[in-house]
Amino acid sequence: MRLNQNTLLLGKKVVLVPYTSEHVPSRYHEWMKSEELQRLTASEPLTLEQEYAMQCSWQEDADKCTFIVLDAEKWQAQPGATEESCMVGDVNLFLTDLEDLTLGEIEVMIAEPSCRGKGLGTEAVLAMLSYGVTTLGLTKFEAKIGQGNEPSIRMFQKLHFEQVATSSVFQEVTLRLTVSESEHQWLLEQTSHVEEKPYRDGSAEPC
């Protein structure tokens, strides 16, 4: 999505930066070779060329908003640290319901095993929810999660998502959050520390 190409979201535990071609060959392509991550994200293995093509497509598509998740502690503690060395996962919003433009499907992946269970995924999701509401005008969110991914299901439930459907065919559950006035206020409180900053010079490389 072009809209977030000049946006950096700085939290306490994570930094969210736009997904660029620079992120593909380092960690991202290696992550997606993992059979565990393929299973958890319902993804197919891609060649490096296919990963580049997908990144370019997602950068241009108006219905996909992607941020790479960086470890904020590492990113801030090491002057000159590259984004690639601080990458731990990604967080996505898909705006694919043409009948309801206020609905977004949210996904998060903390790919680095050593970074799981530390609240990085939670803060990444909260920051993305806030961005979706304030910048994209969304008022409803869905998360589709594999039935066996209990940690992810519990995390979304702690963020006020409620289970609304189960698919035995796809072996996944669908959770939903409707952002009422009270939920919006809660979300603002949870993300009051998150700062939105310009990302680099705001220019994205042409595909």
Swiss-Prot record:
Disulfide bonds: none annotated. PANTHER family: ALPHA_BETA-TUBULIN-N-ACETYLTRANSFERASE 9, N-ACETYLTRANSFERASE 9. One of its GO terms (molecular function) is tubulin N-terminal-methionine acetyltransferase activity. It holds the Pfam family Acetyltransf_3. The lineage of its organism: Eukaryota, Metazoa, Chordata, Craniata, Vertebrata. Keywords: Acyltransferase, Transferase. It comes from Homo sapiens. This is Alpha/beta-tubulin-N-acetyltransferase 9. Gene3D superfamilies: 3.40.630.30. Its EC number is 2.3.1.308.
